[in-house]
Amino acid sequence: MVITLPSPQVGAYPCGYSSARLGTRTQSCARDLTRLRREVVTIACVSVIPLVFTSGWASGINAYAVVLLLGLFGATGVSDEVPAALQRTDVLIVAGVLFLCEAVADKIPYVDSVWDTAHTVIRPVAGAVVAALLAGESGSLPELAAGAIGGSTALMSHLVKAGTRMAVNTSPEPFSNIGLSIAEDLGVAGIVTFAVFNPVAAAVIAAVLLALGIVTVLFLASRIRRFLRRRAQRRAEKRPAPAGGLRPDG
């Protein structure tokens, strides 16, 4: 039995038709690849924003703790998203020493407010720098945009902390300062650690805490004004009296 195979029909699929079809498929694949790249960049951008926001919030409360924790997580291999600049030994040593200084100053009445005043610029700048480094490590978000997010968030949380401390300092007992300082340190450590493993959930918690802090400061506005008046009075009392013991007419 002989099986005869059909001979191919020459010219059934012209060369021009095949080339056009191939070109169309190539263009379609290129468009799909471009769209896929955009989606990947968008997903990466969205994934780094929560960590940027959380690190900014935490930096406004204790910037040295944020740098120290992230640096240790990167140096020990806990997280691959930590920039190499934060893992340097000299950075970790300086951050650790300053963290210990803040841990002491932050628990002493009135000294904590002086410390907060000195860090009105330092904390937002630290939040912006850490956020920019995180964005640069991921390569998905412009460093300038990340710095703006981290710096503004750090400034807001710093103002909440400073305002709350002013209100607490109207009370003569020191235990409120100590308890609040310990709660802040533990909160920063816990949320930054949580952000390394679940950045979205940590960002939600940080946003809720920031909103609650703003509401609390508004509620304590009268105490804050009282603290500012007392500080102004103490400064006026420390001024040297004019010659002859007479005060200038006001």
Show the residue positions of the predicted features.
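Short, highly charged, low-complexity non-transmembrane loops/tails of multi-pass membrane proteins
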Residues: 227-247
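C-terminal ends of transmembrane helices
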Residues: 100-113, 161-169
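Mid-bilayer segments of alpha-helical transmembrane spans in multi-pass integral membrane proteins
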Residues: 125-133, 143-164, 186
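The feature identifies polytopic integral membrane transport proteins across all domains of life
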Residues: 48, 142-148, 168-181
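Cytoplasmic-side transmembrane-helix entry/capping segments in multi-pass membrane proteins
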Residues: 88, 113-125
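Small-residue-rich segments of transmembrane alpha-helices in multi-pass membrane proteins
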Residues: 120-132, 176-190, 238-240
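Helix-coil boundary and interhelical linker segments in multi-pass alpha-helical membrane proteins
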Residues: 41-47, 73-89, 131-146, 195-204
